Amino acid sequence: MTIESRINAINYNFNGTMGIYANDFHGNVIAMNEEALFETASCIKVPILATLLKEVKQKNLSLEEKMTYHQDNFIDGSGILRALTPGLSLSILDFATLMIIVSDNIATNEMIDLLGVDRVNETCEELGMHATKLHNKIDFSKYSQLGTTTPKDYAVIFERAYKGTLWSEDMSKLFIEILKKQHYNTMLTKALTPYYFDAEDTGDEEMLSIASKSGSMDACRNDGGIFFTPYGGYVLTILTKGFSDKLFYPEHETYKYGPQVSKLILEHYLSKEGRF
């Protein structure tokens, strides 16, 4: 039974569409609906970060430069800046980190103001992510979309970072360092054995770490990132759409089927000692 057949069996009762792309960096991929378009939700924050790192690499910006939280960029939703006072000044790196690890929407809007929508989209084209587009800043009262991508496109930046070719080795390392601090990775980790991530009581090294970025809106629940294992690393993206339940809660069906797919792919990879 192929890995794709096993994934289809898991998703048999899923009331929606799931797109998957996984790359083991040995010429093997797992792909389903990999070129279908999906809403990005906060996954678009990964190309925004990549654009920032390109500007830093080109010395157009410095990560130590200060930015200010402006009142007109206030937006509800994820993040912590909405609980703080406008006028707060932080470094560009701090804003970028908040944008990724707690998916801060205000920090994201500040980053979009800094970089510009067009520059982010130019970066996507430069990276070969031709189906990926940032449509606008985050404003739930004005826009129903934030961005679009495909599972295969979304994997590109993770693949580049893993290989050290996201602008440079240093920029790739910084990208991974930031994404490893991610607070929200339910889709990728919910079904995995906790021991993989926390072996403090045994003295053993932790078996698994992940650098990832998720994204959720009414119409989608997405995640993607790099899995680092004792056998090496692989990239996995899981995007969903078309389900009828728009509510946000831990037992949403996307967080039932998506994590099972992630677990299956990890166990398949480990059983083949670093291959798909």
Located regions from the model:
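A short, well-structured edge-of-sheet supersecondary motif
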Residues: 2-35, 65, 238
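Short, glycine/proline-biased beta-turn/loop segments that scaffold the active-site neighborhood
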Residues: 58-84
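Short glycine/serine- and small hydrophobic-enriched flexible loop segments
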Residues: 50-58, 101, 156-163, 263-270
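Structured C-terminal helix/loop/strand segments within mature extracytoplasmic catalytic/sensor domains
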Residues: 1-9, 29, 165-186, 191, ...
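Mid-domain, small-residue-enriched loop/turn segments at the edges of structured enzyme/sensor domains
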Residues: 14-17, 110-169
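Active-site SXXK
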Residues: 39-67, 236
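Conserved catalytic neighborhood of penicillin-recognizing serine enzymes
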Residues: 74-109, 147
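A short glycine/serine-rich beta->alpha loop
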Residues: 32-39, 85, 143-144, 248
